[in-house]
Amino acid sequence: MNLLYRKTKLEWRQHKEEEAKRSSSKEAAPTGPVGPGAVPGPGVRVRDIASLRRSLRMGFMTMPASQEHTPHPCRSTMAPRSLSCHSVGSMDSVGGGPGGGLTEDSSTRRPPAKPRRHPSTKLSMAGPGAETPPSKKAGSQKPAPECRESSRKVPPQKPRRSPNTQLSVSFDESCAPAPSPRGANLPLQRLSRASRITGDLDAGAQEEEPVYIEMVGDVFRGGGRSGGGLAGPPLGSGGPTPPAAADSDSEDSEAIYEEMKYPLPEEAGDGRANGPPPLTAPSPPQQTHILQPHPHPHRRPASALPSRRDGTPTKTTPCEIPPPFPNLLQHRPPLLAFPQAKSASRAPGDGVSRLPVLCHSKEPAGSTPAPQVPARERETPPLPPPPPAANLLLLGPSGRARSHSTPLPPQGSGQTRGERELPNSHSMICPKAAGVPAAHPAPAALLPGPPKDKAVSYTMVYSAVKVTTHSVLPAGPPLGVGEPKTEEISVLHGMLCASSRPPVPGKSSPHSGAMGSAAGVLHHRSCLASPHSLPDPTGGSLTPLWTYPATAAGLKRPPAYDSLKAGGVLNKGCGMGAPSPMVKIQLQEQGTDGGAFASISCAHVIASAGTPEEEEEMGAAFGAGWALQRKVLYGGRKAKEVDTEEDGARAWNGSTEGPGKVEHEDRGPVPSGIPVRSQGAEGLLARIHHDRGGSRTALPVPCQTFPACHRNGDFTGGYRLGRSASTSGVRQAALHTPRPCSQPRDALSQTHPVLPLPLPPQPARERDGKLLEVIERKRCVCKEIKARHRPDRGLCKQESMPILPSWRRVPEPRKSGTPPCRRQHTVLWDTAI
């Protein structure tokens, strides 16, 4: 503050002097050789100084000491000002020679008098009568030179009037608006003072004397007004400047808000500018998303306001949502929620084209999406054929994912990248439903900001489920919809992982019968808002669903949480250790029906996804874990980093969860990738519940959902897609047979009932081969990174924990003892650090 203030003060003085000279010269010219003409410049300067002092007093405690004490106690301190002012005045003195020397003294004495005069200047602004009181005040202030100065001051007062109209008016402007913003506005003032200074200079506050106001909000503005761009150029708040000039008074009162507003519009404009391209064309959205993720991240750190900025613009321009959502969602997931719906509607093609871009731009899912893209693209072709079913599934999944949206939002960043590839069941769906599917990716991207790591997990889950869905597609016939039904199943699987399979409601007519509609549909509906289940058939409903998920407090999301927690149907039950059997039963029941496989997976995914949310919400770790997850995701957005982090987390964070997740993964590897999820929901959720007791609360959710989905997609290679967040799950899913963990296989035996559907995964095994390759690479990288970053992991343990548990699964050793030791070791690291 002191440094900034000093710099500002110096600049202000310099610019003020320059402006004072200019104004004095101008005033002198109109005034002519009249003595007062010479004084006006210094008088104005003195006033500016006084107003600055007051503003400094009001605004900065440090500033008052330097300026107030310096000018008031010591005229010598003011001497430079008065000299500089008089130097300007010297030009005036040329006009009024006799007043020159006196001008210096008067200017020296004037600064105190003029500050007092400023209040009177308010009157003087109203009428010349006010000038007289300033003279009296000045006289009272300085008894001995009073008479001289009074007489001398009187002429300056007249110039003051003209300066009041010019400079003083600007001072009034800065003074009057400043009062409300004083306290809160000072920090912002620095940022906005450039714009306000510029605006004030241009606006020339009509009321000069509100010294208090000036002190409050326009300390820099007032100085800047007189000083021109002194503070303004350094601050470089040019963008807001025009508004500041227009609304200097209201601006000062609303300075804080205004500053926020201006940046908001700027960001809104940027977001809108970026957003509309996605709306316009798929390729622009890709570029926009790729480019915006970086700008928005910068804005985000700049302030929480950016989120507001983008949030408001997002609402205004749905197109803007996709670009800002990846990075800004952390700040405003709810804000993006509604625009999200718009995004869903507006970005049918965009979602497809931009989602992959986002996936790449989002590092966590970026690596995964690349492998995922092939799977997703492969699966995507089938998905488009059944757009109606896709829409239903989309609605269901998005609602589910959104009820689950806290984890899903991370998808936005991670999933957006893989969305097209299949990170998002929605993205997958996007190919299905031109308009609605895109909406899902956008919402996913929007929501991801806050729970980004979950998004990664879910992106992985989506990918895994997606692949599994494709694999399940052969089993899809039980659905009885044929190819479209298979498409729905794919979507459902994507949703199962990401949105707890709300697509089941979408497919509820074909799928609910196979699923044991009570278990599958009920579960999905409880997971997603009933509207989700109902609107499933409607693309329009999808948008509300997105809003529901996007809005953390959105109407739909709360219902989802209610279903997860209160309704709980299967979500909370699954989330809870006891209800997990219900999920398992549902899985088995649904698993009995080949078509119900997705529904079962959905139930478990819901349980896992819902459970993670519940866990997160139930445990303080939810917020902290979420933030950590986001940090981890942001920090290690690269799929390799994510994998490494997750692996490391498994080693040190998922020791307990590691075995459970290993089981889960092994279950997942079972042909019934979704049943794996079911078991994961059951056993893993139970483990998560236990682990939840620990810091894994948030972590199990993404990892669980991820691993389950990966396992669900294991046959399909969905786990491959999910390898990024749940690489361990993916790798183990691929390697589930070789996996040494017998517990997961036990769980697998439990999930085997659903194996019938997983049989289709064979086609996806080709993808699995590629995914396995990637997974192996990631394993190596993760091992290396683990060795290097485990200390970091210890630091980020809480952050990474949510994601890492699934990675903990990645370690083939699955040594419950060793991973716990690692975790403990990491924990020690955290404690030590």
Curated annotation (Swiss-Prot):
Residues 275-285 have a biased composition (Pro residues). Disruption phenotype: Triple knockout mice NYAP1/NYAP2/MYO16 are fertile and appear healthy. However, compared to wild-type mice they show a clear reduction in brain size, exhibiting a reduction in the size of the cortex and striatum, but not the olfactory bulb or corpus callosum. The total neurite length of neurons in these mice is also significantly shorter. One of its GO terms (biological process) is phosphatidylinositol 3-kinase/protein kinase B signal transduction. Expressed predominantly in brain where it is present in the neurons, but not in astrocytes or oligodendrites. Residues 248-257 have a biased composition (Acidic residues). Keywords: Phosphoprotein. Residues 220-239 have a biased composition (Gly residues). Residues 1-45, 64-191, 219-423, 645-674, 736-765 are annotated as: Disordered. Residues 8-25 have a biased composition (Basic and acidic residues). Residues 162-171 have a biased composition (Polar residues). The keyword Signal does not apply. Phosphorylated on tyrosine residues by FYN upon stimulation with CNTN5. Phosphorylation begins at 14 dpc, reaches a peak during perinatal days in brain, then gradually decreases. Residues 111-120 have a biased composition (Basic residues). The keyword Phosphoprotein applies. Residues 76-181 are annotated as: Involved in CYFIP1- and NCKAP1-binding. Interacts with ACOT9, ARHGAP26 and PIK3R2. Interacts with components of the WAVE1 complex, CYFIP1 and NCKAP1; this interaction mediates PI3K-WAVE1 association and actin cytoskeleton remodeling. Belongs to the NYAP family. Activates PI3K and concomitantly recruits the WAVE1 complex to the close vicinity of PI3K and regulates neuronal morphogenesis. This is Neuronal tyrosine-phosphorylated phosphoinositide-3-kinase adapter 1. The gene is Nyap1.
